[in-house]
Amino acid sequence: MFVTLAELIANARADLRCLDAETAMNELQETGGTIIDVREPLELETSPAPQSLNIPRGILEMKVMDIVTDADHPLYLHCATGGRATLAAEQLQRLGYTNVTVITCPVEVVRRHQESQASK
């Protein structure tokens, strides 16, 4: 029997740390973590998230270890709606990253909270 994408994401989230954008941005101020946007570059053109590091979901496993070399460094993942970020976070944990959080809201909300934090 097949599993739907919604079920796959829900099952993955059960084992992941998930936060809303406001909580994640406040926590980032304390942890010095890195926000990773797993959307494709074309998506960034129409809806940028300027304080995020873009590593598209399709190449995440191939690139992340060159960029984030500390397995315990706080990582906060987001995408357009939270689905790809959830699946990406699951993969990062499989790679050995121990401090991975999914921001589970639309990218527009993430951007709004990034802008709010930057203006403080």
Feature-to-residue mapping (PLM):
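Rhodanese-like catalytic fold shared by cysteine-dependent sulfurtransferases
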Residues: M1-T34, P41-P74, A80-K120
